[in-house]
Amino acid sequence: MAAASDVSPQSAYIQHHLVHLNNIGEKQSVIAQFNVINYDSVFWSALTGLVVVLFLWLAARRASAGVPGRFQAFVEMIVDMVDEQAKGIVTNAKSRLFVAPLALTVFLWIILMNALDLIPVDLMPTVWRWTGLGAHHGDPLYYHRILPTADLNVPMGMSLGVLLLMFYYGIKIKHPGGFVKELFTAPFHAHGIAALFLAPANLLLNLIEYAAKSVSLGMRLFGNMFAGELVFMLIALLGGAWTGLNAASVGLGIGHVLAGSVWAIFHILIVLLQAFIFMMLTLVYIGQAHEGH
């Protein structure tokens, strides 16, 4: 095994930027380590959530029946878009009273969390060094990531919430007995002794379906945002390769600026698209919970 000193500066740079501010003070050793709390993800996700709540509160407070201003028109456009999607997917009007605002909140929340990836990679670490909070190992903010959706815990936590809502509406609409019955009798319907033989297979397929929906919903958001964050780090390494006023350094510097600009512009699309996909799948999965096989 290679010694720690054998790690290249580029690898060390990326590894450092991928470590969270957590309660153990170092990188967690396994993917699922339930005794680890990533304080940075909790802080930034809570902060962006509060900003979304404040944004919607201001929009509701400033709403008027007259000619809308630019801010009100912008908010109404977003609300109408989400409401139209909800009406086409969740047919139960009573359920939509909760599901449509939920979808709107999730959409805006994910957009804001994803948008944190557009902050320059080394901006916050530089601020921490200047303030003395992250200059050396052991300092409070030596490890700190500001992109919650690139932390597997956040997207999977949100997808778990969607899964619980699927169970809730499935039980509410079909009643407990009907919900449990559907687990054992769909998608392969049969009667008599054949139904007993098919019951285990039906249950297994339904459990796999629920698990696949939940895992894929969270992993899709996490994978895209983690990859985007990693690309920004690789682009930052081009600028970090500056060794002086020479052809190679100038070329890498120009490449750093061009690649960073192009990727940032493209990443805006990813930020919006991933939020829209998560919102739409949330509506689809909750809508499916209202329907029978």
Curated annotation (Swiss-Prot):
One record GO biological process: proton motive force-driven plasma membrane ATP synthesis
Keyword Transmembrane helix: yes
Keywords: ATP synthesis, Cell inner membrane, Cell membrane, CF(0), Hydrogen ion transport, Ion transport, Membrane, Transmembrane, Transmembrane helix, Transport
Topological relation to the membrane, as annotated: Multi-pass membrane protein
Residue ranges of the TM segments: 40-60, 99-119, 151-171, 188-208, 225-245, 264-284
Pfam families: ATP-synt_A
Coiled coil: none
GO cellular component terms, A-Z: plasma membrane; proton-transporting ATP synthase complex
Keyword Membrane: yes
Listed InterPro entries: ATP_syn_F0_a_bact/chloroplast (IPR045082), ATP_synth_F0_asu (IPR000568), ATP_synth_F0_asu_AS (IPR023011), F0_ATP_A_sf (IPR035908)
Cell compartments where the protein resides: Cell inner membrane
GO molecular function: proton-transporting ATP synthase activity, rotational mechanism
Subunit structure: F-type ATPases have 2 components, CF(1) - the catalytic core - and CF(0) - the membrane proton channel. CF(1) has five subunits: alpha(3), beta(3), gamma(1), delta(1), epsilon(1). CF(0) has three main subunits: a(1), b(2) and c(9-12). The alpha and beta chains form an alternating ring which encloses part of the gamma chain. CF(1) is attached to CF(0) by a central stalk formed by the gamma and epsilon chains, while a peripheral stalk is formed by the delta and b chains.
Known role: Key component of the proton channel; it plays a direct role in the translocation of protons across the membrane.
Record-stated family: Belongs to the ATPase A chain family.
Protein's name in the database: ATP synthase subunit a
Source organism: Bordetella petrii (strain ATCC BAA-461 / DSM 12804 / CCUG 43448)
Gene: atpB
